[in-house]
């Protein structure tokens, strides 16, 4: 098995969104037919020095993560990386694909001069927490979110 980690292409959007739906705690929030909106988010991420990465296996998109790069107001305005939307298709988990995505995201953060990488994971995703811990992440902070209704 050889997984390829590469930037998202416009033709990957629907498959990538379906990977997210398969692992999401709120799949109803996703609309895979809204390709233009997802592509705009990917372009905005790139415009801000980040990237949306996909994992490709046997010509199929089986994983995704979004790498956000921003200048932090702490650490003398140092660059920071936030990894979001890490998902691997359920039938492809525990095969090193998530690790390859994480490694590529971290390499991009280092290349862009980031002093730190951070991520959040839903509190109910215990397997994901074990995965991140096994890859050197520590549960050092507690995160909070507030959703707005439209």
Where are these regions (language model features)?
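Glycine-rich phosphate/pyrophosphate-binding loop shared by adenosine-nucleotide-utilizing enzymes
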Residues: 3, 60-64, 81
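Conserved GNAT acetyl-CoA-binding A-motif
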Residues: 102, 109-121
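A conserved beta-turn-beta hairpin within the catalytic core of GNAT-like acetyltransferases
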Residues: 72-83, 93, 140
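Conserved beta-strand in the GNAT
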Residues: 54, 60-69, 87
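Conserved beta-strand-loop-alpha-helix junction that forms the acyl-donor binding cleft
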Residues: 118-128, 145-147
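A short helix-loop-beta-strand connector motif used in the catalytic cores of GNAT acetyltransferases and
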Residues: 43-54, 82
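A short beta-loop-alpha structural element at the N-terminal edge
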Residues: 4-18, 29
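Conserved acetyl-CoA-binding loop-helix of GNAT-fold acetyltransferases
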Residues: 85-88, 94-107, 134
């Amino acid at each position: 098995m050889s997984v390829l980690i590469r930037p998202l292409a416009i033709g990957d959007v629907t498959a990538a969104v379906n990977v997210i739906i398969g692992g999401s705690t709120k799949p109803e929030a996703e609309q895979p037919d809204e390709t233009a909106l997802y592509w705009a988010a990917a372009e905005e991420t790139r415009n801000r020095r980040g990237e949306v990465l996909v994992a490709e296996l046997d010509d199929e998109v089986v994983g995704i993560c979004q790498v956000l790069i921003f200048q932090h107001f702490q650490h003398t305005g140092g660059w920071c990386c936030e990894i979001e939307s890490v998902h691997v298709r359920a039938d492809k988990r525990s095969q090193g694909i998530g690790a390859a995505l994480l490694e590529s995201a971290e390499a991009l953060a280092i290349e862009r001069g980031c002093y730190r990488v951070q991520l959040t994971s839903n509190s109910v995703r215990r397997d994901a927490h074990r995965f991140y811990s096994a890859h050197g992440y520590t549960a050092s902070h507690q995160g909070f979110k507030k959703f707005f209704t439209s």
